[in-house]
Amino acid sequence: MAVTASSEAMGASSSRASLNALDGVNFFLAALQSGFGPFVAVLLADEKWSQQSIGFVLSVGGFAGLLSQLPGGELLDAIRSKRFLIASGAIMVAVGALAIALWPTRPLVLAALVLQGLTGGLLGPAIAAVSLGLVGHSALAARLGRNQRFASAGALTAAAVMGVIGYFLSYRAIFLASSALLLPLLAALSRIRASEIHFGRACGQPDHHAPTPPPRIPRVTLWKNYGLLVFAGSLFLFQFANAALLPLAGEQLAYRSGTGASLLVSALIVVPQIVVIFLAPWSGRMAETWGRRPLLLLGFSAFAVRALLFSLTGDPRLLLFVQLLDGITGSTLGVLTALVVADLTRGTGRFNLAQGLVGTLAGIGASLSTAFFSLVAGNFGATAGFVSIACAALVLVLIVWLWMPETMPAGQRAQDHTAPG
């Protein structure tokens, strides 16, 4: 289905108030979600849970997130009120955090992590859908870069503040503070004008202007979309290689640095977030100037070099510099994941379902990663583990180089090339 210029021009109608409010939603949502993850493991360990029990509940939460991807995408394509879905998901996360803080019993913690996991197929894709609905396809790259900047800033700020809260107050207080972030998040969300979120655009059907659900291609057609399958496979391989890299590095740092390992691992996580804050808007601009494929190759190549350097040095000071490359990868993928899916599903009405498909395959890759590369490292040594990750990363670069098509619309590319200055 052709996309008319008038359809995309409507993106300019979104008010500055709505776009600024979306900045706040990205910031506070990332901050709210940062209360989970490593802080859950720390709290449960402090509550004298066994390592097996902690691993079990975290795995169940991750599995729930994996199962939620496709239904979440289907829901986002079908329901007009994306703000309602974001609010519902955020409330689920906040209720889960509150339950963990007040009653960290096994049934409640398990239920809280399942609740939080179920939002995984909803919140991130919903932010992308709202962004597309507000600004249209032609301005989406820049908007996604801005989203990534504010999300990284929110996660970084929350991690620092919650670390201080945990140190001076208690680990339970971290989750009380996390749940309190629901209030500013809902306040920011309420400032996004629902009338400015174009329903058709938010589903990848920009010519549909009615308040009813837009026409959609059959679901099975997504499995025949060559570019989408190559991209989803690339993200599967990326997550398969990437998810094990920091845990494997953390194990080696623990052997070498003892009690200082947690601080070193925290630094390895923080450094890329700082890079993303500064680099994400640039990635959005370059996605329009260079095209999607060169930027994707840059991000994956940075990952391959990073994995190789991890195999060559265990010096924590050098690893901090190596982690700058993770910021490059994070900033490019933070923009390109939703952008490439939007390119490939333009005019289909299945943008969000396609996001769910890509998210499912990426999640499967991440879930297999740690077990596989830990097995390699356990049998052949840590260096072999890092080298095998680097080899997988090189295969990833080759796949994108040989088979991934450029997805930026030809008309948009021509417009960029003829623009003055």
Residue ranges, per PLM feature:
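Juxtamembrane intracellular "pre-TM" segments in multi-pass secondary transporters
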Residues: 2-16, 196-231, 420-421
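Helix-loop boundary and gating motifs at the non-cytosolic
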Residues: 12-62, 230, 239-253
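Helix-to-loop junctions at the C-terminal end of transmembrane segments
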Residues: 68-81, 279-291
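Structural signature of the two symmetry-related core transmembrane helices
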Residues: 84-98, 179, 294-309
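Cytoplasmic helix-loop-helix junction between adjacent transmembrane helices
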Residues: 114-151, 340
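A membrane-interface helix-boundary motif in multi-pass transporters
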Residues: 167-180, 375-392
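C-terminal membrane-cytosol helix-exit motif in multi-pass small-molecule transporters
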Residues: 179-203, 396-404
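A late C-terminal transmembrane helix in Major Facilitator Superfamily
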Residues: 350-379
